[in-house]
UniProtKB/Swiss-Prot annotation:
Family matches, as SMART domains: ZnF_C3H1 (SM00356)
Gene Ontology CC: axon cytoplasm; cytoplasm; dendrite cytoplasm; nuclear speck; nucleolus; nucleus; ribonucleoprotein complex
Taxonomic lineage of the native organism: Eukaryota, Metazoa, Chordata, Craniata, Vertebrata
Gene label: ZC3H14
Name of the molecule in the record: Zinc finger CCCH domain-containing protein 14
Role noted for this protein: RNA-binding protein involved in the biogenesis of circular RNAs (circRNAs), which are produced by back-splicing circularization of pre-mRNAs. Acts by binding to both exon-intron boundary and 3'-UTR of pre-mRNAs to promote circRNA biogenesis through dimerization and the association with the spliceosome. Required for spermatogenesis via involvement in circRNA biogenesis. Regulates the pre-mRNA processing of ATP5MC1; preventing its degradation. Also binds the poly(A) tail of mRNAs; controlling poly(A) length in neuronal cells.
Length: 736
């Protein structure tokens, strides 16, 4: 059984619908894979094994359905073949035939006497059409009537969405030529009154296919007149005729695209169907001759479908086939939309879905691509941007800065510039914002100075790169000369306002008129606070306002201090005269409670400090006991040891209430030191027999007295040594 283009499309659409019904349809690749297995004649077990990965529990259900459909198609193909009789031709016999076999398979048959004008055209602006004629092998009247009456209704209910393809096709391409004239033949057909009384059979497909009218030749006409009558019907109705390819289970003729409404196309039919031929063999031989003479682009083609016995192989349509026998009947099929015929067969064409899927994946990968910096980060310090935020964000930092501890970084040389008109406008807006936020005038003045500093910094450093901040030591204090006190106040205010740490760097002076400079120097930097004298402390407080420093980390005090402590610190910052009382400072110190260390108290459970102990007292029992590897240092409760203070096991996992007396481990035996070797020659050498002799014994030369080197450093005995064979020991023989 060959699966043609049309039936392959039908089967594939049915498979796709079934996959969607089972919820296993993802894309077009799975139906393509199933079609390949159908073409390779895979068995049901093989399909079940291959599709179990895709369909899961629905695999057996799907394969049973698919093979049921294929078995029905095979049965439809084999049953009409047993009824064939290829002895006579219908046009050579005078027996009237009222029925013809067309489109047996899965198509629904509707018989009705519809005039040829009842076929509308889906595309009236197009004149192209496809004409197909079918040549049938002769069959007896009884067999034809029996099969048409019984099989048509049966096939209409068995296989609905599919059509069985013609196994193979003979193709004859017909191209119109200027010298092909059949005017006389057409005139004869127009004068024939029988052309208006021709019975028709309309066949409607179950799918979205246009209807086809099948024209039957009258029984009283011979083959030639029947053909001409059909041609006349086609010419009269050509402007409105359209249909699809018709599949005949036994044999069919399919005409490809042809312009029958034009006279030059109709002239091409003279060569094929002329009244000179009196038998079909001569007519077919002439058609083959005409076809072989013209190897030009195809205008229309005459196709004969042959029947093979269950070979199941798909073959390409060939343009040259042998002789044909059988009657010629005609049908018109015009596609609703003319398609461009590809040069390659569908099995060898690229899958469009794969290409579209690859393009979409490529676009997604491009959109997800991010650019990374090529320079590796060498330090892991906090980073702050050069460009500053808006004025509203700066004011928010001012409000937060009131509850924070001011930071003083190592000395910074700062240069501030002020514009003329721009800064006046900004100052007006700043005062309005401050009035809304209800900030005191001192903070407003400081904020204005900081805004000027930020404007200057953003103007000089226009890049958006980040710089690394340096953390200052909390114990450092800066002493500024009296004439530089205003600059120091500005630096302090900047640090209170921003809450950020600033990099120690020199700012580039812009090209502007002379402007006030605020410089912080290292003049008079005192010793660390622990080594400062009282006089130095007095000088510090006279030269600048006191800056309160706490031991909080540079992340801020909110996460480390209690609300009471934050309230006291905020009051201290808001006090302009520095009159923060010692009583309130004592409250701050009392509010700070030391956190317990995560180390077990060695006196527990007999610790006298109770809850005030700085170390951890276990509460919950240990879940890993007795396999706990921490033993007495575990932060959970272990059971009491029954030996308590008398326990001598050093790694006892139990709890000991009383203090144990440490057991001294026995000292390991120390090996006696090796006697030091002396450079003094042993006086008994070479006769010394003491194994632990501390004196020097020279090493013997391996060549002994036979050494020939005059500068040999090894020992050579002065006495004669026995020869080698004399030094060999032999076991004495025992007498029995």
């Amino acid at each position: 059984m060959e699966i043609g283009t049309e039936i392959s499309r039908k089967i594939r659409s049915a498979i796709k619908g079934k996959l969607q019904e089972l919820g296993a349809y993802v894309d077009e690749e799975l139906p393509d894979y199933i079609m390949v297995m159908v073409a390779n004649k895979k068995s049901q077990d093989q399909m079940t094994e291959d599709l179990s990965l895709f369909l899961g529990n629905n695999t057996i259900r799907f394969t049973v359905w698919l093979h049921g459909v294929l078995d029905k198609l095979r049965s439809v193909t084999t049953e009409p073949s047993s009824l064939k009789s290829s002895d006579t031709n219908i046009f050579d016999s005078n027996v009237p035939s009222n029925k013809s076999n067309f489109s047996r398979g899965d198509e629904r048959r509707h018989e009705a006497a519809v005039p040829p004008l009842a076929i509308p055209s889906a595309r009236p602006e197009k004149r192209d059409s496809r004409v197909s004629t079918s040549s049938q092998e002769s069959k007896t009247t009884n067999v034809r009537q029996t099969y048409d009456d019984g099989a048509a209704t049966r096939l209409m209910s068995t296989v609905k969405p599919l059509r069985e393809p013609a196994p193979s096709e003979d193709v004859i391409d017909i191209k119109p030529e200027p010298d092909d004239l059949i005017d006389e033949d057409l005139n004869f057909v127009q004068e024939n009154p029988l052309s208006q009384k021709k019975p028709t059979v309309t066949l409607t497909y179950g799918s979205s296919r246009p209807s086809i009218e099948i024209y039957r030749p009258p029984a009283s006409r011979n083959a030639d007149s029947g053909v001409h009558l059909n041609r006349l019907q086609f010419q009269q109705q050509q402007n409105s005729i359209h249909a699809a390819k018709q599949l005949d289970m036994q044999s069919s003729w399919v005409y490809e695209t042809g312009r029958l409404c034009e006279p030059e196309v109709l002239n091409s039919l003279e060569e094929t169907y002329s009244p000179f031929f009196r038998n079909n063999s001569e007519k077919m031989s002439m058609e083959d001759e005409n076809f072989r003479k013209r190897k030009l682009p195809v205008v229309s083609s005459v196709v004969k479908v042959k029947k093979f016995n269950h070979d199941g192989e798909e073959e390409e349509e060939d343009d040259d086939y042998g002789s044909r026998t059988g009657s010629i009947s005609s049908s018109v099929s015009v596609p609703a939309k003319p398609e461009r015929r590809p040069s390659l067969p569908p099995s060898k064409q690229a899958n469009k879905n794969l290409i579209l899927k690859a393009i979409s994946e490529a676009q997604e990968s491009v959109t997800k691509t991010t650019n990374y910096s090529t320079v590796p980060q060498k330090q892991t310090l906090p980073v702050a941007p050069r460009t500053r935020t808006s004025q509203e964000e700066l004011l928010a930092e001012v409000v937060q800065g009131q509850s924070r501890t001011p930071r003083i970084s190592p000395p910074i040389k700062e240069e501030e510039t002020k514009g003329d008109s721009v800064e006046k406008n900004q100052g007006t807006q700043q005062r309005q914002l401050l009035s809304r936020l209800q900030i005191d005038p001192v903070m407003a003045e400081t904020l204005q100075m900081s805004q000027d500093y930020y404007d200057m910094e953003s103007m000089v450093h226009a890049d958006t790169r980040s710089f690394i901040l340096k953390k200052p030591k909390l114990s450092e204090e800066v002493v500024v000369a009296p004439n530089q006190e205003s600059g120091m106040k500005t630096a302090d205010s900047l640090r209170v306002l921003s809450g950020h740490l600033m990099q120690t760097r020199d700012l580039v002076q812009p090209d502007k008129p002379a402007s006030p400079k605020f410089i912080v120097t290292l003049d008079g930097v005192p010793s660390p606070p622990g080594y400062m004298s009282d006089q130095e402390e007095d000088m510090c407080f006279e030269g600048m306002k006191p800056v309160n420093q706490t031991a909080a980390s540079n992340k801020g005090l909110r996460g480390l201090l209690h609300p009471q402590q934050l309230h006291l610190l905020s009051r201290q910052l808001e006090d302009p005269n520095g009159s923060f009382s010692n009583a309130e400072m004592s409250e701050l110190s009392v509010a700070q409670k030391p956190e317990k260390l995560l180390e077990r108290c060695k006196y527990w459970p007999a610790c006298k400090n109770g809850d005030e102990c700085a170390y951890h007292h276990p509460i919950s029992p240990c879940k890993a006991f007795p396999n706990c590897k921490f033993a007495e240092k575990c932060l959970f409760v272990h059971p009491n040891c029954k030996y308590d203070a008398k326990c001598t096991k050093p790694d006892c996992p139990f709890t000991h209430v009383s203090r144990r007396i440490p057991v001294l481990s026995p000292k390991p035996a120390v090996a006696p030191p090796a006697p030091p070797s002396s450079s003094q020659l042993c006086r008994y050498f070479p006769a010394c027999k003491k194994m632990e002799c501390p004196f020097y014994h020279p090493k013997h030369c391996r060549f002994n007295t036979q050494c020939t080197r005059p500068d040999c450093t090894f020992y050579h005995p002065t006495i004669n040594v026995p020869p080698r064979h004399a030094l060999k020991w032999i076991r004495p023989q025992t007498s029995e």
